[in-house]
Amino acid sequence: MGDDLFKEARKERDDFEELMNACDLAKMSVKNNEMVHGLETFGVNHGESSSENKPTEIMKVVAPTVEAYVGSSSSTTVTKPSGGAVDGIDQKEVRQDGTSVQKDDNGFIFYKCRFCGLTFNFMNTLRAHERIHDVSQPYVCGKCGESYEFACQLEYHAAQHSEIDGFKCDCGRTFFSYTEMLYHKHTDDPIELIGAPETTTVLVNKKKIIPVTEQDLPQPAFVTEGYEPKHPLRVYSDVRSKPYICEYCSKSYSDSRGLAYHMYSHRGEKQFNPRASRYMMGREGVGYTDSRSYYLFPRTSGYVSPRF
């Protein structure tokens, strides 16, 4: 029983491998645009004559021929060779700055140097390599032939060939940024007027402003009448144990934090305490009753014992 299962599994594996080989053959024939030339038969001897053994048929595909090609000289065009390609490269593109971009069958992109022909995997690596050729203006426009030192200058120049509407100055130059149009220089302009905005007249209502003195400002009642302390004045021993005393009601505290919370009562403000709200304490999953965030809230008059 075990041998039969093993043979059946091996047969299924062989059938699957044969199917995959046929799929690979079809892909290669479509890719290379060539016909399968034929089938080659051969015999395998296992101690017997070749005539007694049944020949096995296999498929053979002719390798693609290598043909050199030259891409189109026009910019932003993709050309493909008629037959095969050099080193598996089947696409070529020439950008506006003259950089040759090649793409192989596996989808990998290569950037070719314009001066020596070396290829690189990344554009930044190619730009760093082109500096060794000591070219002052390596970035050349593909439409008008003007060269620039930096790539950003070429990108700004390439916008002039597009249909983007810009800002035109009276001198005839067109700018694609209003700030550059406003601050660009003219040969006949004086130095002090370069970049200066046009002068405009602003009408100001010159109303006489009466100065306000300190006597005209209203004074609070506690400045003139004073406060009567709600608690009796502390003796020296109490002041030593609670040195932080309120200047309005003479109530003392042992630390500055307690005095700071007490000052809210004189400001007319009331600090929100979520533990004093039955609605907030009844909610679950908000973190107010969580032991980790319990001490984040002060223990004020609405203190509620924790539930954990």
Swiss-Prot record:
The keyword Nucleus applies. Keywords: Cytoplasm, Developmental protein, Differentiation, DNA-binding, Metal-binding, Muscle protein, Myogenesis, Nucleus, Repeat, Thick filament, Transcription, Transcription regulation, Zinc, Zinc-finger. It comes from Caenorhabditis briggsae. One of its GO terms (molecular function) is RNA polymerase II transcription regulatory region sequence-specific DNA binding. GO terms for biological process: locomotion; locomotory behavior; muscle organ development; myofibril assembly; post-embryonic body morphogenesis; regulation of transcription by RNA polymerase II. The lineage of its organism: Eukaryota, Metazoa, Ecdysozoa, Nematoda, Chromadorea. Pfam families: zf-C2H2, zf-C2H2_4. It comes from the Eukaryota. SUPFAM superfamilies: beta-beta-alpha zinc fingers (SSF57667). Probable transcription factor. Required for muscle structure. Its dual subcellular localization suggests that it may function both as a muscle adhesion complex protein and as a transcription factor, or work together with transcription factors, to influence gene expression. Thought to act as a molecular bridge between unc-97 and mhc-a at the M-line of muscles, possibly in a signaling role. A zinc finger (C2H2-type) spans 111-133, 139-161, 166-186, 244-266. One of its GO terms (cellular component) is M band. This is Zinc finger protein unc-98. Transmembrane segments: none annotated. The N-terminal part (1-106) mediates the nuclear localization, while the fourth zinc finger is required for the localization to M-lines and dense bodies. It is found in: Nucleus; Cytoplasm. Its main location: nucleus. InterPro entries: C2H2-ZF_domain-containing, Znf_C2H2_sf, Znf_C2H2_type. The keyword Nucleus applies.
